[in-house]
Curated annotation (Swiss-Prot):
It comes from Pseudomonas putida (strain ATCC 47054 / DSM 6125 / CFBP 8728 / NCIMB 11950 / KT2440). [4Fe-4S] cluster binds at residues 352, 413, 416. PROSITE patterns: ACONITASE_1 (PS00450), ACONITASE_2 (PS01244). It is an enzyme of class 4 (lyase). The gene is leuC. It catalyses: (2R,3S)-3-isopropylmalate = (2S)-2-isopropylmalate. Its EC number is 4.2.1.33. This is 3-isopropylmalate dehydratase large subunit. Transmembrane segments: none annotated. Catalyzes the isomerization between 2-isopropylmalate and 3-isopropylmalate, via the formation of 2-isopropylmaleate.
Amino acid sequence: MAGKTLYDKLWEAHEVKRRDDGSSLIYIDRHIIHEVTSPQAFEGLRLANRKPWRIDANIATPDHNVPTTPERKGGIEAIVDQVSRLQVQTLDENCDEYGIVEFKMNDERQGIVHVISPEQGATLPGMTVVCGDSHTSTHGAFGALAHGIGTSEVEHVLATQCLVAKKMKNMLVRVEGQLPAGVTAKDIVLAVIGKIGTAGGNGHAMEFAGSAIRELSMEGRMTICNMSIEAGARVGLVATDATTVAYVEGRPYAPKGEQWKQAVESWKDLVSDDDAVFDTVVELDASQIKPQVSWGTSPEMVLAVDQRVPDPAAETDLVKRGSIERALKYMGLTANQAITDIKLDRVFIGSCTNSRIEDLRAAAEIAKGRKVAASVKQAIVVPGSGLVKAQAEREGLDKIFLEAGFEWREPGCSMCLAMNPDRLESGEHCASTSNRNFEGRQGAGGRTHLVSPAMAAAAAVAGHFIDVRELIQGSAA
């Protein structure tokens, strides 16, 4: 009998019942809640005269709608948009009513759901983790089975702590070799998406492995798993190892004492067996990956910074040619334009992909002693949580950013999506460390270019895209 993949093991450990139609009832260990996808779920509970079945499995925080400017210290009343204010207020009321732990808007622990749960130790290896947000795949970095769910499923989890799901296929993305200086986890995952496309992982749980992945910090692994959804995979995974254990140890929700020892022992099996069989295998050489920049309106429209935007006339596939033509028109680019000739109006460093302390350090390293270009209208840095913000300020990163001309903000989803005051105007180009570059994602008519934090900082000081390796002392240009 063939060995089991990590996904197989996690699935089997949580399978309550296999149903006649081939689906299974899966037990959920951790449920993360935010203000946008939960109001209807809580209302559904009330209408059915139900209560959350396991209160301590839930953790909540507002993130999508919250303002990131200092005015928000005034509380919910500082939220100008009435719908956004109502959603945040409703989350507070629902969590208060049912006794669910919530890090409210001005709690230092508040932040983006996919940042606060790991930093609290609420995401643990071997867990099943769900949230009403597609980037819940982030938590797979811990060797956890994590994915996004819809509002009706949020209600199901609150009421029963279970979900009905069908098992996916297994995909292995193996990245071997050493990353060059200036190349990051964000560049790895963008390169993967560029290689397999946004549908490449459809129907699969995507495990990332290989020496380059093992060398990544937990924050780098979270970045990669975060964007597995952009590669078409609902689930991203990295095997549990010593790096995982070291990150989790001592965090508020992590096991303590003898329970910690037992947990660490049990986590040793959270790896794919050597003889496990994957349905699909993709391989990349880390040493050949360069800093990446998305040029179009899909994450798969991505190139190395030293390349040129494609020419639709050179594409023989008529469907692909049309897609390139539409993307060029929306993005205001011309065929064969050098990536480094793309000028930026705004720069956004933040989001659940890249707003953790290591991301901010990488950006600050580039910003230090430099100034945001006069042609850049705005460059903002938005920490992923209040705790990340406090850590960055202890390290003096805020001063580096402010002296360089960046804005230093309060935590939240911010400019990743146009659901709060941070957004692009039509026609503006933005170097963004977020995860999606769809039309209108950052504001109607806004043009998003996905990059790493270091690349975003480099773009801010240059006013256009530049190979960050040119700014890193001792590395090849």
